[in-house]
């Protein structure tokens, strides 16, 4: 079903206006996570997260699952430095990729909370992240801390964008999303060495450097980059001829409403798509790379493809993955199929309502809004809430034909835009 609409509906607008329209206001249908609300920052809370006057914010690029994480061989690192954790390699890689948090961040926090990775005792294996998580068990704590970091990171970014849209100052204290996420988490639960003068990020930076040999100049970033990064991210959209839809050219699938990667909160970086939205046990279909790039297999059910420009797409609930780490692919290269079995679709746990592809857009490791992104001839308008399926607000606009395509209606993939 297609609805002819005026081209004016899809005309460019102010990035900050789009931000206001696209900020999360709820919605948990088809949620991929635990239905937790977005982390809400306030001026009062941020007043408790001040960096020491001599400190610089942490580099977002080393916090997120971007180029540094993709170049990191987690399994080999664990085999050499933490053999007791080697069988957890896929679990760590999967959830680090899902939340797009560098696994080095997680390993650093483990050392800070439970001691050296090389010979963990029974307590450390049961609670590797100590007081940072109220959960019990290795797997539960790992996922909980990654989830907390993700919620805090994007909650801070959302707060900054709201402030900018209201024409209020942002970034004046040099605090960025990575620093806010880690500082908030560490202040709540971590033991801070008196040597660090009560500065949890100082202890974190020293531990990170010791574990991975990262120069201080790379681990930190100038304070004046914060506001510039925010302004640039608000206007982000991939080149109009870079991406196609993530299913075979010549086929029609049915996407649902845009939502955050976890199904609640911000940004609306993701949509789910299926050929016919069947029940578990039904036939499923080929998932393809939406663009050219380098493959990262995050687990048996999750793949990422990263373009040299920094744009990336994530593919979750996969089966029969037929690409490998480091492989170069072009747009429309088959990656696998979306899983028809719930245990395969959720290979490392989680939740899902039925067979589908969970597709996400990222830039330099950060989830970014689909607003204004083009996939072939279609430009997306994300709506005003998670899983907003109302075609007056959420739609794929065919820029060539001037037609608007609604959620849960077959959407034909003609390939890349010419």
UniProtKB/Swiss-Prot annotation:
- Reported EC number(s) for this entry are 3.4.24.-
Q: Name one GO molecular function term.
A: metalloendopeptidase activity
Listed CDD domains: M23_peptidase (cd12797)
Which Gene Ontology terms of cellular component type are present?
extracellular space
Coarsely, its chief localization is secreted
- List S-S links within the chain: 301-347, 391-406
**Chain positions listed as propeptide in the UniProt record:** 32-236
- List locations, semicolon-separated: Secreted
Recorded superkingdom: Bacteria
Going by the record, the broad EC class of this enzyme is: hydrolase
Catalytic residues in the record: 317 (proton donor/acceptor), 356 (proton donor/acceptor)
- Give the binding site residues for Zn(2+): 259, 272, 358
Variation of activity with pH: Optimum pH is 8-9, inactive at pH 6 and below.
Q: How is it modified after translation?
A: Processing of pro-LasA can occur extracellularly and requires elastase (lasB). Secretion and processing may be linked.
Q: Which cofactor does it need?
A: Zn(2+)
The knockout note for this entry states: Loss of staphylolytic activity (lysis of heat-killed S.aureus).
Q: Which GO terms describe its biological process?
A: peptidoglycan catabolic process; protein secretion by the type II secretion system; protein transport by the Sec complex; proteolysis
Factors inducing expression? Optimal protein expression in vivo requires both Zn(2+) and Ca(2+) during growth (at protein level).
PANTHER family reported in the protein's UniProt record: CELL DIVISION PROTEIN YTFB, PEPTIDASE-RELATED
Record's family?
Answer: Belongs to the peptidase M23A family.
Protein name, entry field: Protease LasA
Q: Which organism is it from?
A: Pseudomonas aeruginosa (strain ATCC 15692 / DSM 22644 / CIP 104116 / JCM 14847 / LMG 12228 / 1C / PRS 101 / PAO1)
């Amino acid at each position: 079903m297609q609805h002819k609409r005026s081209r004016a509906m899809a005309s460019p607008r102010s990035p900050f206006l789009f931000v206001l329209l696209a900020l999360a206001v709820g919605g948990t249908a088809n949620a991929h996570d635990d239905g937790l609300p977005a982390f809400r920052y306030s001026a009062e809370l941020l007043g408790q997260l001040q960096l020491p006057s001599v400190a610089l914010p942490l580099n977002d690029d080393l916090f997120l699952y971007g180029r540094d994480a993709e170049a990191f061989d987690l399994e080999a690192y664990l085999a050499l430095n933490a053999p007791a954790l080697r069988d957890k390699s896929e679990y760590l890689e999967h959830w680090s990729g899902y939340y797009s948090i560098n696994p080095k961040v997680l390993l650093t926090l483990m050392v800070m909370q439970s001691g050296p990775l090389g010979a963990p005792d029974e307590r450390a294996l049961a609670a590797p992240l100590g007081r940072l998580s109220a959960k019990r068990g290795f797997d539960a704590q790992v996922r909980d801390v990654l989830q907390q970091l993700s919620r805090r990171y994007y909650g801070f970014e959302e707060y900054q964008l709201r402030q900018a849209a209201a024409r209020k100052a942002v970034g004046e204290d040099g605090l960025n999303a990575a620093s806010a996420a880690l500082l908030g988490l560490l202040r709540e639960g971590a033991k801070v060495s008196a040597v660090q003068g009560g500065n949890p990020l100082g202890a974190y930076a020293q531990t990170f450097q010791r574990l991975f040999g990262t120069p201080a100049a790379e681990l930190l970033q100038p304070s004046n980059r914060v506001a510039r990064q925010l302004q640039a991210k608000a206007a982000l959209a991939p080149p109009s001829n870079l991406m196609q839809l993530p299913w075979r050219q010549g086929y029609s699938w049915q996407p649902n409403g845009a939502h955050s990667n976890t199904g609640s909160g911000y940004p609306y970086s993701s949509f789910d798509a299926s050929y016919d939205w069947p029940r578990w046990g039904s036939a499923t279909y080929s998932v393809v790379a939406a663009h050219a790039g380098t493959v990262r297999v995050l687990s048996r059910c999750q793949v990422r493809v990263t373009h040299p420009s920094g744009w990336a797409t994530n593919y979750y609930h996969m089966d029969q993955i037929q690409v490998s780490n480091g492989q170069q692919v072009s747009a429309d290269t088959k990656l696998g199929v979306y899983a028809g079995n719930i245990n395969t679709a959720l290979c490392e746990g989680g939740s899902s309502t039925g067979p589908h592809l969970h597709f996400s857009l990222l830039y330099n490791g950060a989830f970014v809004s689909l607003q204004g992104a083009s996939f072939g001839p279609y430009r997306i308008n994300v709506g005003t809430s998670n899983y907003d399926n109302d075609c007056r607000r959420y739609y794929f606009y065919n820029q060539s034909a001037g037609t608007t395509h609604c959620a849960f209606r077959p959407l034909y993939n003609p390939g890349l835009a010419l």
